[in-house]
Amino acid sequence: MFRRTLARSLGIIGLAAILAAQLAQAQDSPPIRVIERVDGAIYVVRARDGAELKIALADNAQIAGIIKASLSDIKQNSFVGVTAMPQPDGGLSAVEAHIFPEAMRGTGEGHYPWDLRPQSTMTNANVEQVVSAVDGRTLTLKYKDGEKKITVPANAPIVTYVPGDKSDIKPGAKVFIVAVKQANGKLQGRAWRIGRDGVTPPM
């Protein structure tokens, strides 16, 4: 998958309280990608690895839409999340980046392993510096106990968040879900990120 809450204007309250631990838990679960069907209160989803999973919507689930943004939207002092791959020269190259609204500043702050690809990492941090180049930008990302420089290629998908609600969670929707396994072994979705206008959440 946090320390801040999403603004009431987004209709997403209390995100910080739930998601800090869930991000780590989500890395051990299949990333969830497409809503297949709805069986009563259960959403049947197809994970990236092809597995079919049954997810219950938590009573206090946080729902947000994901829309396309651009590299030029990432500016100094933006708070972003960047999935990156290690490079032969020891640097990091972004696979994707998502721009958090101001009210989500601090969400999942840090640098840690991620499950998008083997050896991929996630860095959620403040943009300290942006250096532009013909083929992309290099971001200096500063978080509570360190910093990373990550090159963002011009073709890396960039997205941001918009308000969402339960009506967005429907068959065919492309999603990223932070799901937690309950004591009974069933999965409960606490944070739902739904692609809008043909966008696939790239995290």
Language model: regions and residue ranges:
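Positively charged n-region of N-terminal signal peptides that target proteins for export
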Residues: 1-4, 8
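Short, flexible, surface-exposed loop segments at domain boundaries
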Residues: 2, 22-203
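Bacterial N-terminal signal peptides
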Residues: 9-22
